[in-house]
Every structure is written in structure tokens, then in C-alpha cells.
């Protein structure tokens, strides 16, 4: 039986925390930040947990 591989696109976008939650980065904070307010860019910092419905699907892609 061949080794099970994780989905490389998903592994670059999602992380699984120690408690088992799946987290992702928020969108819109890569470039063109000049016209975005400081308040908006601060709000977009950090990670966002996925909903339970999506988390199960992503865990399957990450082979967990």
C-alpha cells in the first residue's frame, strides 16, 4: 500500500493547533496596504479558526 500524502495546497494554507483546531490566515493583508486603514490591517492580523464543517474536510486533506 502506498504512503498517504497530504494535500500540498492545503498544507500551505492551514495549520492544526495543539488542541486540534484548524486555523487559517485572514485574506486581504498581502499587498496594496497603503489605502487600507491601520484599524483594518490590525483586524486582519492573526489567525481565524475554521468552522466545524470545514475543519473536518481540511483535516482529511492534511491526512490527519
From Swiss-Prot:
It comes from the Bacteria. Keywords: Ribonucleoprotein, Ribosomal protein. Residues 1-15, 23-43 have a biased composition (Basic residues). Signal peptide: none annotated. GO terms for cellular component: cytosolic large ribosomal subunit. InterPro entries: Ribosomal_bL35, Ribosomal_bL35-like, Ribosomal_bL35_CS, Ribosomal_bL35_sf. It holds the Pfam family Ribosomal_L35p. The keyword Coiled coil does not apply. Residues 1-64 are annotated as: Disordered. PANTHER family: 54S RIBOSOMAL PROTEIN BL35M (PTHR33343), LARGE RIBOSOMAL SUBUNIT PROTEIN BL35M (PTHR33343:SF1). Belongs to the bacterial ribosomal protein bL35 family. This is Large ribosomal subunit protein bL35. It comes from Frankia alni (strain DSM 45986 / CECT 9034 / ACN14a). The gene is rpmI.
Amino acid at each position: 500500500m502506498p504512503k498517504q500524502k497530504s494535500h500540498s495546497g492545503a498544507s500551505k494554507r492551514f495549520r492544526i493547533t495543539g488542541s486540534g483546531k484548524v486555523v487559517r490566515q485572514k485574506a486581504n493583508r498581502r499587498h496594496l496596504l497603503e489605502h487600507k486603514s491601520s484599524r483594518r490591517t490590525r483586524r486582519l492580523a492573526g489567525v481565524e479558526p475554521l468552522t466545524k464543517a470545514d475543519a473536518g474536510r481540511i483535516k482529511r486533506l492534511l491526512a490527519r
